[in-house]
């Protein structure tokens, strides 16, 4: 094989094969520059509908449209070469029927080049997952806290405590048996997440779940510390980019007002002297 041969991107079968092995690494991305950074280190790059809140300032993910997901999916695809690109199906794009879900999943895959779609829901979405998988659409499932159902759930609460644990377990079994290649467990208690991971044959990807899941996902902007006042319990900050950006912008503003920027090295001379400019 030539050393210049393109790298084969990660595929659904590769993720399935990681069950019980080295933990799977996933982060969200919404732009080309960030996608390049994520792609260098992660197995999965997720264009999450969280972009509605993170990028567009919406209060929930419910206002996210197919057009928004396609636009950001295309941008992320331009920065992705080795990780598996997964794009969220937005609220209202798949719940009506399996046929509706396939039409929109087909559009996402055709227009973004993504390798899989993610949709929220457990037992009630199993038929749709099965329908999509049978037609060549790899599906990442998402159970536990499902943000698109925030109004029905009464907020962003932990799911699966007490008697509710059986429901979440049954959701996990249902999506696995329907053919999903992995499942996100969001805000599911540690012990239950471990039991689900042991019980089902597909990889579990935790977010606010357990270190014993088969992998982890975080929202990139959260783990980079871009939002000063948003500190959910399940997010570890690996950087403080918000503070760094604030300092840089403040310094720029001060230097412009003091006429210290642009300095001589940042401007062009009226006449060429020596090297061409």
Swiss-Prot record:
Q: How is the cofactor bound?
A: Binds 1 Mg(2+) ion per subunit.
Among the GO molecular function terms of this UniProt record, one is: 3-methyl-2-oxobutanoate hydroxymethyltransferase activity
| Positions of 3-methyl-2-oxobutanoate binding | 49-50, 88, 118
Q: What is its EC number?
A: 2.1.2.11
List the active site. 186
**Record keywords, A-Z:** Cytoplasm, Magnesium, Metal-binding, Pantothenate biosynthesis, Transferase
Q: Which metal ions or organic cofactors does this protein require, according to UniProt?
A: Mg(2+)
Reactions listed under catalytic activity: 3-methyl-2-oxobutanoate + (6R)-5,10-methylene-5,6,7,8-tetrahydrofolate + H2O = 2-dehydropantoate + (6S)-5,6,7,8-tetrahydrofolate
Biological process (GO) annotations held by this record are: pantothenate biosynthetic process
- Gene3D superfamilies with a match to the protein in the record: Phosphoenolpyruvate-binding domains
Pathway annotation: Cofactor biosynthesis; (R)-pantothenate biosynthesis; (R)-pantoate from 3-methyl-2-oxobutanoate: step 1/2
* Top-level taxonomic group: Bacteria
Localization, per the record, is: Cytoplasm
Q: Which family does it belong to?
A: Belongs to the PanB family.
Q: How does it assemble?
A: Homodecamer; pentamer of dimers.
Quote the function comment for this protein. Answer: Catalyzes the reversible reaction in which hydroxymethyl group from 5,10-methylenetetrahydrofolate is transferred onto alpha-ketoisovalerate to form ketopantoate.
- PANTHER family, alphabetized: 3-METHYL-2-OXOBUTANOATE HYDROXYMETHYLTRANSFERASE
Protein name according to UniProt: 3-methyl-2-oxobutanoate hydroxymethyltransferase
The species is Cereibacter sphaeroides (strain ATCC 17023 / DSM 158 / JCM 6121 / CCUG 31486 / LMG 2827 / NBRC 12203 / NCIMB 8253 / ATH 2.4.1.)
């Amino acid at each position: 094989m030539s050393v210049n041969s393109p790298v084969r991107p990660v595929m659904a079968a590769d993720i399935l094969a990681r069950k019980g092995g080295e933990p799977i690494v996933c982060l969200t991305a919404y732009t080309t520059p960030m996608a390049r950074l994520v792609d260098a280190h992660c197995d999965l790059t997720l264009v999450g509908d969280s972009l509605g809140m993170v990028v567009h300032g919406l209060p929930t993910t419910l206002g996210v449209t197919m057009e928004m997901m396609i636009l950001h999916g295309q941008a992320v695809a331009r920065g992705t070469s080795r990780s598996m690109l997964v794009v969220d199906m937005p609220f209202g794009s798949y719940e009506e029927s399996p046929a509706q879900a396939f039409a929109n999943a087909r559009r996402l895959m055709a227009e973004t080049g993504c390798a899989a779609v993610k949709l929220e829901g457990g037992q009630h979405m199993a038929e749709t997952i099965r329908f999509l998988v049978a037609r060549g659409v790899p599906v990442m499932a998402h159970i536990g806290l499902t943000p698109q159902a925030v109004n029905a759930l009464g907020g962003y609460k932990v799911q699966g405590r007490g008697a509710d644990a059986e429901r979440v377990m049954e959701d996990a079994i249902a999506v696995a048996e329907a053919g999903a290649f992995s499942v996100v467990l969001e805000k599911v208690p540690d012990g239950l997440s471990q039991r689900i991971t042991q019980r089902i044959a597909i990889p579990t990807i935790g977010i606010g779940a357990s270190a014993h899941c088969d992998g982890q996902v975080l929202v990139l902007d959260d783990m980079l510390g871009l939002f000063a006042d948003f500190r959910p319990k399940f997010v570890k900050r690996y950087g403080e980019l918000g503070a760094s950006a604030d300092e840089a912008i403040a310094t720029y503003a001060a230097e412009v007002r003091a006429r210290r920027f642009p300095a001589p090295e940042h401007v062009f001379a009226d006449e060429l002297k020596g090297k061409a400019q």
